[in-house]
Amino acid sequence: MTRLCSAVLLVGVLVFLPGLAVAQQPAPDRLAPTTGLASNQVQVLAPAGDSLWSGPLLTLYLEPADRPSPEDSLLAAQAPALTEEDNVVFALNARTEPDAPAQVWAGLAFSAGQNTAAAGGFLVSTDGGETFARRADHLDAPEDTTVTYGPATLPATAVVQEANSAPQDLAVGPDGDTAWVAGNQSGLRRSVDQGRSWSRVVLPPDTLRSITPDSSYSFRVGPPQSEGAGWRNHVVFSTLVDETGTLWAGTGAGLNRSRPQDVGPQGERAWQRFAAGPQPERLTGNTVVAVAEQPRVDARNPIWLATWAGSGGAGGQRFGVTMTPNGGDTFRKVLVGERIFDLAAREARVFAVGEQGLFVSENQGQTWRSINEFRLRGDTKTLPPEVTTRSVAVTSAALWVGTTDGLLRLDRSQEARLLSGASDPPAPRWTLLRAQVPVNPSPDQTSEQVPDVEAYAYPNPFVPSRDQLVRIAYELDSAGPVTVTVYDFGMNKVWSATENQPRGQQETTWDGTDDRGLRVPTGTYFYTVETGGQTVRGKILLTN
């Protein structure tokens, strides 16, 4: 699961630690039940059979038949690298085998400031997530200034800085011990010992369409440098090992393919690079941020790519999706003009999520149905239109969509209703999973993450361009009208909304505009929640 450009969101992720309020004692070693997601920004997903892993703090969703007790649908991994440090999960991969526990890999990142994500190492589990082993990052030592490729010893840039080298994507080979990480500026790296050590994988430079270890080269290995050296094709955002054992790597200069027959006796790989161009059989853009495989029973599995317009290479690059039905022999462009973040597939259906919502195709991308309104189960509400879809995955039981406002689940039996022309016209109903932080918590729930307040706003600080909306949470003893008002620092009214709300904990959203729809300036804002003759107050720090 790739996370290109997610550093901007990383620094804004509000992470809750449900269940840790009473954790004055050491954290347990095993998966522990939790009441909600760790964050409402869900950017990484990894299916594992019926179950689903999600970031940013390794939450596992279990279907009813797999739950330790009926109410325990969500479990949280108790990994100190996440619960006691500033790391979040930036890349996820879960590998399942019949009659064996899932193997789970998590690439970690932390904020290095200035909207930059930094490499934080890895977590690896071989027992279905019950326990995780911590692994160091995949970076170079200062003396790693050469790399052997075939008969050549190539000069290399030692990538020693954690910043801009956060794991973007993970792929695991069929043996379960070999893994590849798409490491942004650190390139493509390989581990053959479950992440205990990593080695650099040599990819073609921007000037070559293919390389082979049978030939000799002299190009420098490394990302672009300020003095002009380095290559965009050595900046890697996505990777995949498909059913045939072919390794794919999406970079800033196209898509790289290495088949099983391309591997030499020393493990060095021949590569072919595919790039963008105006021709129909080329990629829409050179920046490949996601790679997904479509399982088929009647043909070779197609490969789907989220391809973005890049800063180099051929002119006329576009955002969109590119697919190959035959392992790279030919390519086809679809969804041209759409900025797509993630892809998933189940049999004939392909799912893509992007800035404009969820896209579904059942005819290999010839036509698409777009879904940007998500009606919620058991409710008359839909997700706010400002919410962005960020990730997508399929399990054997459901379709999952990660958003900037929670995790959506749709029963597999309801997927057909997503398609235009479906015989059953009612729109499908989604289940929404979100972070659960109580208002007026009990004493044993109170902590730094769960303050004892009557109302709160999150995310706070609120960055409208990044967060899209802020939620003001409060609790009602009985159903009735609620008025939420926002004031500026001089206590001048900026915005107000009145709506009828049911009893219990509720939320009202604000998008950072005034009553005229104009964006408000950076500053401190105060809000009031008025209901049933009572008023509670709070504060929001807004920055543009």
Language-model-derived ranges and their functions:
Residues 25-48, 72-97, 109-116, 139-174, ...:
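Short coil-to-beta transitions that initiate beta-strands within beta-rich domains
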Residues 51-54, 103-105, 178-180, 189, ...:
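Conserved beta-propeller blade signature
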Residues 443-444, 457-460, 472-474, 491, ...:
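Terminal processing/anchoring signals of secreted or surface-associated proteins
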Residues 524-544:
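C-terminal tail/sorting-segment detector
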